[in-house]
Curated annotation (Swiss-Prot):
The gene is hisS. It is found in: Cytoplasm. Its EC number is 6.1.1.21. This is Histidine--tRNA ligase. PANTHER family: HISTIDINE--TRNA LIGASE, MITOCHONDRIAL-RELATED, HISTIDYL-TRNA SYNTHETASE. PROSITE patterns: AA_TRNA_LIGASE_II (PS50862). It comes from Methanoregula boonei (strain DSM 21154 / JCM 14090 / 6A8).
Length: 410
């Protein structure tokens, strides 16, 4: 028996409907901010991802060569592809661009709960705005999208200017080593690394910055930074907008990627793999041959959101099972067409069952049975049976449709 590839999943109808219902809530949340959906190819030129992340990322990617000898990769994330699309298709479009996406990505890593080789991201990119209000809007947008799902989570917001100010005397390689320790909260390893660099004096400042939770503390620890007013404005806008967050100036990922504001979101019940949101301000376009445009965005790990939510019950459509005899089939086909035109799911028997067997099947799969025999067909009517209450009525098709719709509205 052929099995699905490791790290992938099948979604049966109930789960798929639950996923679509949560996805729809997120889409509606970002739509209200004016963000419009875009779509990029599932595979891109390999260079799109190695330019920013280096050749090492190839170990985590699905890479292949096509028949023309081109090196391609299944996308491991969406942001780079969206910026590539901006350069190719929308460089002269009026700014800012408010784009969102929902798409699957692929990474070759060890599968575990909340981590898959094929996974879905919901995200947004704001391209061409470089203000405190732009930073704040993207954070508010991410918060609205996650709050719409009903997931229980916490938002942490920081700014890399503080960390960069403390690490200014270190070369990029040394900065990455320090940030790796901070990312893992490995303070013992941090102290050893700084001692080896003869920078032990930084240890107390870095540890204090990671642990501080107010702007005043952060400014006191890191000293004067050029972005002081911008940071204060961003946090002020978030406060005025009622966004619930905590400050975290120890966010240590992406020091060589993000340019300023950064934020992360964590679900309360996912254990070690609890990050469901990551985002911040960045500049990527110039790496891909475009202008040096300011951008800000985020990605939500949709699969982890679904795991955190647990069992989700999507609203179910009312289903009408069309039950008919051979003599009533022509009229039944017409009635089914009317039900569907009215937006009601109508299912006909395809198995050649008798009337009793059709009713038995409908009782397991439908809310109403629309029974049509020769008598009903001759009279242009149907016998509508509520399969939950057992109540049945003889009605014309329009009245039956109204009855079923009224049930669905309750």
């Amino acid at each position: 028996m052929i099995q699905k590839p490791r790290g992938t999943r099948d979604f049966l109808p109930d789960e798929m409907e639950a996923r679509r219902s949560i996805e729809a809530k997120m889409r509606e949340a970002v739509r209200r901010f004016g963000y419009r959906e875009v779509c990029t190819p599932e595979f891109e030129e390999l260079e799109l991802f190695t330019l920013r992340s280096g050749e090492g990322i190839m170990q985590e990617m699905y890479v292949f060569e096509d028949k023309g000898g081109r090196k391609l990769a299944l996308r491991p994330e969406i942001t780079a592809a969206v910026i590539r699309m901006y350069i190719n298709e929308a460089k002269v479009a009026p700014k800012p661009l408010r784009w969102c996406y929902f798409a699957d990505c692929f990474r070759y890593e060890r599968p575990q709960k909340g981590r898959y080789r094929q996974f879905w991201q919901f995200g947004a990119e704001l391209i061409g705005a470089d203000t405190a209000l732009a930073d704040a809007e993207v954070i508010m947008l991410a918060a609205e999208a996650l709050n719409a799902t009903g997931v229980t989570w916490e938002l942490k917001v920081g700014h890399l200017a503080f960390m960069k100010n403390l690490l200014a005397d270190l070369d990029p390689a040394a900065q990455r080593r320090v940030m790796a320790h901070l990312d893992k909260k490995d303070f013992e390893g941090l102290a050893e690394t700084l001692a080896g660099m003869r920078k032990s004096g930084l240890n107390d400042s870095l540890t204090a910055l990671v642990e501080c939770r107010t702007l005043a503390e952060a400014f006191e620890i890191a000293g004067t930074i050029p972005e002081k007013e911008r940071v204060e404005q961003t946090m002020g806008i978030l406060d005025a907008s009622g966004v619930r967050y905590s400050l975290n100036f120890g966010i240590a990922r992406g020091l060589d990627y993000y340019t300023g504001m950064v934020f992360e979101g964590f679900a309360e019940n996912l254990g070690a793999e609890n990050q469901i949101l990551g985002g911040g301000a960045y500049r990527l376009a110039h790496l891909f041959g475009g202008d040096d445009v300011a951008s800000c965005g985020f990605a939500i790990g949709f699969d982890r959101v679904m795991v955190s939510l647990g069992e989700v019950f999507a609203a179910k459509d009312t289903i009408a099972g069309i039950v008919c005899t051979d003599e009533g089939r022509s009229f039944a086909l017409s009635v089914a067409r009317e039900f569907r035109a009215a937006g009601i799911r109508a299912e006909m028997d395809l198995m050649g069952r008798g009337l009793g067997a059709q009713l038995a099947h409908a009782s397991k799969t439908a809310d109403f049975a629309v029974v049509i025999g020769k008598r009903e067909a001759d009279a242009g009517q149907v016998t509508l049976k509520n399969l939950h209450s057992g109540e049945q009525k003889t009605l014309d098709p329009a009245a039956a449709i109204a009855e079923v719709k009224a049930h669905g509205a309750r």
